[in-house]
Amino acid sequence: EDVARLAEFITRIRPLADAVVAMYHRLPAGQGRKLLDQALEQGLHTLDDPPEELTALFHQVDHEPIWLDRAQLRLACEVSHRVGLAGELVLRNLSLMGGYLAAAAAKPLAFTGELDRMANRRLVETGKFWIDVTTPGGLERDRDGFKSAVRVRLMHAQVRAMLLKSDKWDPAWGHPLNQWDSMATILEFSVIFLSGLRSLGFLFSKREREAVVHLWRYVGYLMGVDERLLPACEADAMRALYQVIATIGESDEDSRRLGEALARASLQDSGDGWLAKRLGKVEYTLRAGYTRYVL
């Protein structure tokens, strides 16, 4: 049953976002993105005659699922920010680095090239996204977290469309940025994040852990992850994590190159002075040591 479930979701994408990207190409250059931005910033109702693709997308994201509990979202934000800089260490050197172990899931990033430059860019973009969605109230309809989740969803759809047109994409890797990989990404920010913090000595109550899983369940919903894949509780999330680990496959040369580029980012950001370079090497050693410890 689990194998059949995996086979279904590695070839399944996020059709509502993909339809919006197709709309971009159908309309005059820039018009589709302008319509999306207006619907996101001011509401779909402000468009005189919205394309059906946008209507379908916003019908989904503007609908709050029956299971959504905003009190849990508030608690999850408090938990996420009370850990301070340790949260950044775990997200960068466990969650992101661990994601590169899955060769097929790492392929979309490897296709971009210029891995050193892209590693720094990904750190900045991921950091902003995390701050947006974990800021108290950030997932309210008119706040940055909600908008960031939807925009990342559309960005993934654009990358997916580009890769599927490339003759270098191997169908054996599944669909790029597919549903299974997207669910695994949600786990990186929830139970893997919590596990990494616990490895550093942080303690969380069951209520706090459930709240973090709940927040990322809603983020996944906004990003178009199939609700059947979204963990409803910590136990579901851990079960899904075991399934991901069991089916992750072997890492490859692209995985290694991505990991090295991410590790080198601290050296590149350290500055030009002697002391700055020395401190950069200390940071590199600290981060590499933590990655070896947890992975």
Where are these regions (language model features)?
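Mature, function-bearing regions of proteins
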Residues: 1-186, 190-295
